[in-house]
Amino acid sequence: MKKLLNRLFSRMVITCLLVAAQLIFFMVEVFKLQQYYVLVAAILHLLSFIAVMHLLLKDVNPSIKLAWIVPILMFPVLGGLLYLLYGHIIMPKKLEKYMKHAAEWDYETDLYANMAYFSDVIKGQPPYRLFKYTEDYAGSLVYQNTDVRYYPMGDDVWPDFVDDLKSAKKYIFLEYFIINPGEMWNTVLEILKEKVKEGVEVRLIYDDIGSVFYVPKYYWREMESYGIKCMAFNQVVPFLATIFNNRDHRKIAVMDGTVAYTGGFNLSDEYINKKSPYGRWKDNGIRMDGDAAWRFTILFLQLWNSIRNEDKHILSYRPAEQKEHLNDGYLQPYTTNPLKKEPLGENIYMQMINDAKEYVYIFTPYLIVCNEMMTALKLAAKRGIDVRIVTPAIPDKKMIFRMTQSSYKELLRAGVKIYQYTPGFIHSKCILTDDNLTSIGSINMDNRSFYHHFECGVLVYDSSIIAEVKYDMLSVSYTHLTLPTKLEV
């Protein structure tokens, strides 16, 4: 009963009710204006015409244009108004202004720290053009001198994650889409409290929508009371606006600038299988011990300072000593930004698919992509590339699952192999090609990740973990789908 009441009076329910109330109010006001119907209808039709013209001139993916133009033309009275409310990126002006200029000090911070290289370090090697693109459009340089560890399950990440939190001496930076009180988050929080007492600087960013069901509205104030610097990213305002877009979907943990984690896991019990709402939960992660961790420090501080603008001298967070590590390949951490026109995550995935010579293996919880991505996957299979995609057998969102399944037949007909992870839900976000290149991070293969969210990942080339990622992708339990396919939830 208590759980039901908590659900009924949760922030998300209240927010949705307030939005619904505003919609009803708007419809009532329109009804009151029925005596001016001709004038109101003319204005709304004009608004729809302007919206369509704006979309036609806008530099965005054609499939996104079409997704808006068709309903606007079908429902011209309300279509333009809905586009005005929901068709734009809406961000705080301060954040937008800062993020547009954040890349200006990327190279300087990296190079002054003497930890990074330009992409020319791999010139002549297969992924050079991809690394060069990511350098030019994300400000991401290339790192060596880093020990890399791959984890096929969140359960595997957890012990090392806890040990590294406990070992931090100077600072801990955490940035996650979801924090949810339970064994995982409560354990992390107790460690963070102890670290604050030891004089370690602790900062936390969580996404307000991602955590809306789990923590109170002003949870960040509770964290501040413990001495943890904290902020809720892009806080929910229950007005007719795009509250579900432009979220901070990144997963970043940095300890002392020497150790960093990223991957698909959040700070909630299902990610380490302490609870099982959808069967066995599979999520992967990567640990970087060495120079590449510094880049994740920069990525965290970029976003932090876009809100608070506290740190004038980011190099003060640079590790005092650069330890020598075995050079386990080349790493290029990157982040995507919905304020930019460049869909970096989508382009990285597409380029890896187009460049593949032998195979493309993909883990993704969702598969809702544009026509260009579908064409790239189908064309790769048709030219003899072994293309395999692993998606969940048990969905976390049934509607999204059906949308994912709607792509299967078209891909199967082209020769793409589709597998469903039979033990439960796969939340890993990973793409692997040709025994030498992988990208691991927070990016789903859907348009929300590609176009609407802040995401992160790391390109890894010529590393020992490539074989581990391949083994993971080939050894998971799955059902191989074939035509004809009956798609049921």
Residue ranges and their predicted role:
Residues 1-347, 351, 355, 395, ...:
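N-terminal localization/anchoring segments of enzymes in phospholipid and broader phosphate metabolism
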Residues 366-385:
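Helical hairpin unit composed of two closely spaced alpha helices linked by a short loop
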